[in-house]
Amino acid sequence: MPLKIRELIKILKENDFVDRGGKGSHRNFLHPSGAKITISGNLGDDAKPYQEKEVKKMVKEVQENEKK
């Protein structure tokens, strides 16, 4: 069962990403390290598989960079 967009946003916020707004259903998130990611879709929508992979990849990269 796919995650909801709101769940992806929660994961990003738990990992220190800041919501920088956006147009329409797009939301831009910025991490203090400079990492950027855009999530599209309304909060209750199912996330696309590529969105889930992108968020997991971005969180993993940020966590690895913080360890250095």
Q: Residue locations for each model-derived region?
A:
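Hydrophobic aliphatic residue packing
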Residues: 5, 9, 37-39, 55
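Extended, charge-rich alpha-helical interface modules
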Residues: 14-15, 37, 64-68
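A short, structured beta-strand/loop element
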Residues: 19-45
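Polyanion-binding surface elements
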Residues: 1-16
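C-terminal structural segments of small proteins and small subunits
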Residues: 43-68
